[in-house]
């Protein structure tokens, strides 16, 4: 709208009347782009480098599931503050090739007691990481004091290995569950 008004202001006991004129805006609104559901979201790599750098072919693939090796790289880069120098850390898992691009990241997080493998001694770097595993890695990387299990989510039981990690992150509003009260600890 437009018009004129007077604003009465009192400063240090002195009252002033200040005339204010509101004019019709001539600014052109900036249109909000519409995104088709079939289009992949655009990731601004300026804000994600060096933590998430995409694939060798230049793609980012934000809708893909994250592998255990990829998460190790992201968390290690965040923790270290930059990319790790080659040869500084080496993963000890028999299924992580010494020349694999993610080897040094897994080795770094192993060294910092952030990552562990499976009971059979493997790491399975190409497996999709689960929500429970991500919760454990984040809680360990942040060195959070874990809260005890109290049944926040209906599908996280007292027997789930990641229960305290999940509930700690939920308590800190870092993770959340689904509308039906579940968390999906074994889902990607």
Language-model regions: role of each:
Residues 25-69, 75-104, 111-132, 140-164, ...:
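Feature responds to low-complexity, polar/acidic, surface-exposed segments characteristic
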Residues 1-30:
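Extracytoplasmic soluble-region selector
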């Amino acid at each position: 709208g437009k018009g004129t008004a007077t604003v009465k202001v009192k400063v240090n006991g002195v009252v002033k009347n200040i005339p204010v004129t509101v004019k019709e805006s001539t600014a052109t609104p900036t249109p909000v782009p519409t995104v088709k559901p079939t289009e992949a979201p655009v990731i601004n790599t300026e804000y994600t480098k060096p933590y998430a750098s995409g694939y060798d072919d230049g793609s980012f693939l934000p809708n893909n599931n994250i592998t255990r090796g990829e998460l190790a790289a992201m968390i290690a880069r965040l923790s270290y503050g930059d990319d790790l120098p080659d040869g500084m850390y080496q993963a000890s898992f028999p299924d992580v090739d010494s020349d694999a691009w993610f080897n040094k990241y897994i080795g770094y997080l192993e060294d910092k007691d952030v990552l562990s493998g499976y009971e059979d001694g493997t790491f399975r770097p190409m497996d999709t990481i689960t929500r429970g595993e991500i919760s454990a890695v984040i809680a360990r990387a942040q060195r959070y004091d874990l809260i005890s299990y109290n049944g926040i989510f209906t599908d996280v039981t007292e027997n789930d290995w990641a229960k305290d990690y999940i509930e700690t992150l939920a308590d800190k509003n870092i993770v959340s569950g689904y509308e039906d009260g579940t968390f999906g600890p074994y889902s990607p």
